[in-house]
């Protein structure tokens, strides 16, 4: 009662073994974009104004924080940093320089709230 299909070697078994290996190799070789950190600055209370981007640039630049861009957006300011490692220092600097604001640090790949003041 043995089926002839069970005795013959099938091509499926090697393919099932090679597929995970191929998937692993492709995921490791794909180019990865570096993580980018954004600081999202909003007023603490509705109706309060935010400083202009140049003021924010001056505060961060004088402390050596490299900035990619500063963009106003819907009563908030988005600051993109050149180095994700500087996000903690930048958040601390802005929390002191802008006491009436909320500063949230976010990573662009899977938004993660890093810190909040």
Swiss-Prot record:
It is found in: Cell inner membrane. GO terms for cellular component: plasma membrane. GO terms for molecular function: protein kinase binding. Pfam families: SecD-TM1. InterPro entries: Modulator_MzrA (IPR026574), SecD-TM (IPR027398). Residues 1-9 are cytoplasmic. Gene3D superfamilies: 3.30.70.260. Keywords: Cell inner membrane, Cell membrane, Membrane, Transmembrane, Transmembrane helix. The chain crosses the membrane at residues 10-29. It is a single-pass membrane protein. It comes from the Bacteria. Residues 30-117 are periplasmic. Interacts with EnvZ. Modulates the activity of the EnvZ/OmpR two-component regulatory system, probably by directly modulating EnvZ enzymatic activity and increasing stability of phosphorylated OmpR. Belongs to the MzrA family. This is Modulator protein MzrA.
